[in-house]
Amino acid sequence: MNLVDSIARYSKGYDLPQNLVMAVAKVESNLSMHALRAEPAYRWMWNVETHKPFRRLNNPEVVSNEAPFDFPRPVEFFASNDTEWQGQRMSWGPFQMMGAVLRERRYKGPFPAICCDPDLASKFACSHLSRLRDRFYKKHGWAGVVAAYNSGTPRKTPDGVYTNVGYLNKVSISGAQKYLTFLRA
């Protein structure tokens, strides 16, 4: 199955607007399955043993390429703790999901598989978007859901503009105008 078909399948399965999901993938990667980006300052790591956020990182750990001694890795496949550390701090595949978010969504496989399997990428992105919808839609609408996809939570400036309005506008003009209207820079 190709990416477009996978997006159609999983957006329907998770009751998400297909155009919105497609627009997110267009903005994140231009629909490239092989998109990959290092995010070395990312600090919200996931503990795969407790299935909870990993402890707060100190400043040297945030910039380190090596995992702290107590950072666990999945036992389901062979990878070092350092590989897991780096993988959680990268965004993967057509939806550019952070490795830590993939672990939070209970993805247990090797991260590069997200860049090779459209169904896998679409399934986890739609699962994550549906979770964000369930948390934020009533109060913030689709703009808040998409803002949270990009930055973790929907955040606004004191004058009521989303802090990542530029991202929201890109998603809107990429095919989600129906869901993201009346935004301003």
List PLM regions with ranges.
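N-terminal export signals and maturation junctions of secreted/periplasmic proteins
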Residues: 1-13, 31-33, 39-55
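General N-terminal targeting signals
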Residues: 37-38, 48, 114, 162
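Catalytic phosphate/metal-binding cores of nucleic-acid and nucleotide-processing enzymes, i.e., regions
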Residues: 23
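Non-catalytic cell-wall polysaccharide-engagement segments
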Residues: 1-14, 55-185
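Short, solvent-exposed loop/turn elements at domain surfaces
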Residues: 33-35, 105-106
